Swiss-Prot record:
Pathway: Metabolic intermediate biosynthesis; 5-phospho-alpha-D-ribose 1-diphosphate biosynthesis; 5-phospho-alpha-D-ribose 1-diphosphate from D-ribose 5-phosphate (route I): step 1/1
Domain of life of the organism encoding this protein: Bacteria
Consequence of substituting D220E: 4-fold decrease in the affinity binding for Rib-5-P in the presence of magnesium ions. In the presence of cobalt ions, it shows a 15-fold decrease in the affinity binding for Rib-5-P
UniProt protein name: Ribose-phosphate pyrophosphokinase
Coiled-coil regions listed: none
Enzyme Commission code(s) on record: 2.7.6.1
Length: 315
């Protein structure tokens, strides 16, 4: 069996180190930096010939820099005769650009990124909670899309929730919310119906379901500016919700997110470590982070040993 080796770019160094610790190994020796003109510089400083290589790199902000680091690392490892290269992308950037809106002259950038990764020599992709699962079909290589929900659910069960109800922040998240509700002792579910007049701005319209006197658990795959989340929490509290907790896998937290969360009525926001948090976000008392390092380490181990990934999520 080829030697398994882990490498990491500069996007998620702490998560990469946690994964390495879980696998009782160390991160590979690679210098990933910049030339004086800002171009990505990569040098692999150890033998990888024939190795089973995993590169851990979220393509979060700065998205283009992190994406270029990833593809240049793949090329360096491919030219060094690596046996198999798996791109471990905890947060897959550009995933929201997954379709062309009718009559709009826009790209399908998620497909562009998939082609880019395939063209430089990625053999397999491991990612977490793709914004749209059909993005897997954009790739010409196998994609393992694992779920953060077991980690989030385990934390929810520790909250001692009072008459809980799972809330989907929009119609598109109903499937995710229903799955969480079923696992959370088959609890009830509510849906927030909203309109989005422009990007990153949403207006809550009404709530489908009775939330009065109940602990509400909002679930989503990501939090961007937090505007949608904060308006949803306000609507829930206005309709009598007792407490509001928000759970999401990917903490993008762009723009005015810190200020939005600081002034929000949300009791607690719980996210995963697929994207590093800024110091400002870390300082907020109502934001808490869970690690996916154990789950990702197990997925990497299974891929390396040619074992089933889907078996990790069988209940």
């Amino acid at each position: 069996m080829p030697d398994m080796k882990l490498f990491a770019g500069n996007a998620t160094p702490e998560l990469a180190q946690r994964i390495a610790n879980r696998l009782y190994t160390s991160l590979g020796d690679a210098a990933v930096g910049r030339f004086s003109d800002g171009e990505v510089s990569v040098q692999i400083n150890e033998n990888v010939r024939g190795g089973d290589i995993f590169i851990i790199q979220s393509t979060c902000a700065p998205t283009n820099d992190n994406l270029m680091e990833l593809v240049v690392m793949v090329d360096a490892l491919r030219r060094a005769s690596a046996g198999r290269i798996t791109a471990v992308i905890p947060y897959f950037g550009y995933a929201r650009q997954d379709r062309r809106v009718r009559s709009a002259r826009v790209p399908i950038t998620a497909k562009v990124v998939a082609d880019f990764l395939s063209s430089v020599g990625v053999d397999r992709v491991l990612t977490v909670d793709l914004h749209a699962e059909q993005i897997q079909g954009f790739f010409d290589v196998p994609v393992d899309n694992v779920f953060g929900s077991p980690i989030l659910l385990e934390d929810m069960l520790q909250l001692n929730l009072d008459n809980p109800i799972v809330v989907s922040p929009d119609i598109g998240g109903v499937v995710r919310a229903r799955a969480i509700a079923k696992l959370l002792n088959d609890t009830d579910m509510a849906i927030i119906d909203k309109r989005r007049p422009r990007a990153n701005v949403s207006q809550v319209m009404h709530i489908i379901g009775d939330v009065a006197g109940r602990d509400c658990v909002l679930v989503d795959d990501m939090i961007d500016t937090g505007g949608t989340l904060c308006k949803a929490a306000e609507a829930l509290k206005e309709r009598g919700a007792k407490r509001v907790f928000a759970y999401a896998t990917h903490p993008i937290f762009s723009g005015n997110a810190a200020n939005n969360l600081r002034n929000s009525v949300i009791d607690e926001v719980v996210v995963c470590d697929t994207i590093p948090l800024s110091d400002e976000i870390k300082s907020l008392p109502n934001v808490r982070t869970l690690t996916l390092s154990g789950m990702l380490a197990e997925a990497i181990r299974r891929i390396s040993n040619e074992e089933s990934i889907s078996a990790m999520f069988e209940h």
